[in-house]
C-alpha cells in the first residue's frame, strides 16, 4: 500500500495539494457508455487490497467500491454517452467523461493525476501517469469506482437487451458478442463506429 502512495507523497511534499486520481472504464467495448471517476483520498489512506481494478475479482471490486466511497474526501463519477462517442470519437468522449467527473468533486484539486499517456483535454492542471491504476492510490481508487459503476450500468443494459449477453462480457468484443450482433443486428447502445470492421 505504501508503494501506491510514493508518487503522490512526492507531489504532496512539493506543496501541491489536494491531488485527485482520474481513470476510465469502457473505452474498448463495442457497446455502452464510457465511464470516468475522479477521487481525492486523504493522504496516506490505507485501503487493503487497493490495486488496479483489472486485477481484482468482481466481488472484491464491489467491496472496495463501498470502502472508497466511505474513505474519500471527495469523488465524482460521470459518463459520456454512446452518441457522444460516435459524434466526437472515443478519446474525446473519454476526456469529456473525465472532466464531468472532476467537475462533480466537492473539493477542487490542485492537480489531477490521469491514468495513461494523454491529458490534453483535461480542464484542470493535470499530469499523466502511465500504468497509474497500479502505481497511484488515487488513480487505483478511481479505476475501481469507474469499473464498478460501468459494470452496473451494463447489467441494466443486459435486462433491456437480453439477446447480447452484456451481463457476461460488459459490451466487450467477445466471440459470443460478435455472434449475437450478426444474428440480431446492433442495439441502440452499440457503437456503430466500432462495428465497421465486422465482416
What kind of feature is each model-predicted range?
Residues 1-199:
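RNase H-like, Mg2+-dependent phosphodiesterase core
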Amino acid at each position: 500500500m505504501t508503494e501506491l502512495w510514493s508518487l503522490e507523497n512526492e507531489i504532496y511534499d512539493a506543496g501541491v495539494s489536494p491531488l485527485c486520481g482520474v481513470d476510465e472504464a469502457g473505452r474498448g467495448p463495442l457497446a455502452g457508455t464510457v465511464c470516468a471517476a475522479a477521487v481525492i483520498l486523504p493522504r496516506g489512506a490505507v485501503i487493503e487490497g487497493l490495486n488496479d481494478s483489472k486485477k481484482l475479482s468482481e466481488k472484491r471490486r464491489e467491496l472496495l467500491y463501498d470502502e472508497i466511497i466511505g474513505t474519500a474526501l471527495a469523488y465524482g463519477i460521470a459518463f459520456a454517452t454512446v452518441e457522444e462517442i460516435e459524434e466526437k470519437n472515443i478519446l474525446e468522449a473519454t476526456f469529456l467523461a473525465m472532466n464531468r467527473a472532476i467537475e462533480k468533486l466537492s473539493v477542487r484539486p490542485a492537480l489531477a493525476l490521469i491514468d495513461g499517456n494523454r491529458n490534453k483535454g483535461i480542464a484542470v492542471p493535470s499530469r499523466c501517469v502511465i500504468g497509474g491504476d497500479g502505481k497511484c492510490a488515487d488513480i487505483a481508487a478511481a479505476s475501481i469506482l469507474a469499473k464498478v459503476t460501468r459494470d452496473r450500468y451494463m447489467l441494466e443494459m443486459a435486462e433491456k437487451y437480453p439477446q447480447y449477453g452484456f451481463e457476461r462480457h460488459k459490451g466487450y468484443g467477445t466471440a459470443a458478442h460478435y455472434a449475437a450482433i450478426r444474428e440480431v443486428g446492433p442495439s441502440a447502445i452499440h457503437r456503430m463506429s466500432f462495428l465497421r470492421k465486422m465482416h
